[in-house]
């Protein structure tokens, strides 16, 4: 399998069949899936998310409903098709809200698992109204997809972005506050991630939330800025797609810039000045035709 390429070129990785099987059983048990349930396979087979949907179907005896990966997966299923489980990326879910037919079919799915990228706040608010279970997942290729889940709607929903590890998964932090995962059933070694996190054990169980990637920390003039926090602060005020990125600077060491599809850079800079602290403000607004993304739909930030 290939890694997602979040921080560079996707890398080839060997996965053990026994560990893929263990991961599949963990998911099916967590979601209460049973033999005969229908699983929608709508993700590319080139990456772990698509492969694991097939493995889950084989291991847990689910009926596969396989369609060509596309941005509007709900257009490829019938109104009377009963889907018990579907895994999608945020873009597919967002696109499926665009018309009544797709929305109706999406709402009929019994378990929707969303992974591969952050879920926009506005999208999450809409998903909270869904009648069946919607989950946000945390994981990566090295853990053979997700090792933690967060309920978005219904009972036990968590709107504060806390994830709960699946049974058999241990969570700690390293000296840089990055998440360390000990999941021997799916990963042969302890995995040190690049995700800065907060771990909480005060509720009688372990939970964690992701602050951002350590790769996305901008050290500008002695001030450390987490790119994801800047994006979250700006998101409610900007309608056009945008991302923040960092580049080398002779003056500051590193500096933050914004890439945006918006036409009016002056207005965008005004919003940044009004909303952001002084040291969070981008040094330049770069207008692009389309925000650069990886093959798995994640922002491509290593551009400079």
PLM regions and their residue ranges:
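Conserved AMP-binding A3 loop
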Residues: 1-25, 32
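AMP-binding/adenylate-forming
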Residues: 15-22, 38-95
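Active-site glycine-centered loops adjacent to acidic/histidine catalytic or metal-binding residues
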Residues: 6, 116, 139, 195, ...
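AMP-binding/adenylate-forming catalytic domain of the ANL superfamily
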Residues: 277-298
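Gly/Ser/Thr-rich phosphate-binding loop
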Residues: 99-156
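Conserved S/T- and glycine-rich ATP-binding loop of Class I adenylate-forming
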Residues: 3-6, 39, 54, 86, ...
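AMP-binding/adenylate-forming catalytic core of the ANL superfamily
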Residues: 194-280
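AMP-binding/adenylate-forming core of the ANL superfamily
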Residues: 170-198, 261
